[in-house]
Amino acid sequence: MKRERINPDTLELDERVVLINRVSKVVKGGRRFSFSTVVVVGDGKGHVGIGMGKAAEVPDAIRKGAEAAKRNLIRVPLVHSTIPHEIVTKFAATKVMLRPAAPGTGVIAGRGVRPVVEAAGIKDLLSKVYGSNNPVNVVKATFKALSEMTSLQEMARRRDMTPQELNARRMRRETTEAA
């Protein structure tokens, strides 16, 4: 399935720096330091992108990361203020579980998951990170999970139901679990 290109110029994107890491290269004269960054951009209305930048100076690395993130935008299907369904995704040694939450719950997430889901505009979400909690891999696993998310309409079409039937069924299941 080919991903549609999203034009970042049509969106009001906010940048968030998730990680700034100083890395060194050992050369004959000593160590050469450079910086790598992970940047998340999003409009808070269902669009989010992640990017990595590397440069000799921090501002240049952040700028490169932001440019990469704008080239890597995806659309995330939202249901009210949460995601349409639970998803578990693995990236490298990191496994991320994202679950929809009731309105008012807030974003219950760690340092790598929170900036990605908040940039996408998700207000209510439960998450858990299993395995490696390396921030780069957590951000990439979260982004992968959001990119694999399917909309309520798509899920209903696959099951030969209307979105209203599917949502009613889901609500019944959630109320019986709460009781």
From Swiss-Prot:
The keyword Ribosomal protein is assigned to this record: yes
Disordered: annotated span: 160-179
Coiled-coil portions: none
Gene Ontology biological process: translation
Domain notes: The N-terminal domain interacts with the head of the 30S subunit; the C-terminal domain interacts with the body and contacts protein S4. The interaction surface between S4 and S5 is involved in control of translational fidelity.
Subunit structure: Part of the 30S ribosomal subunit. Contacts proteins S4 and S8.
UniProt protein name: Small ribosomal subunit protein uS5
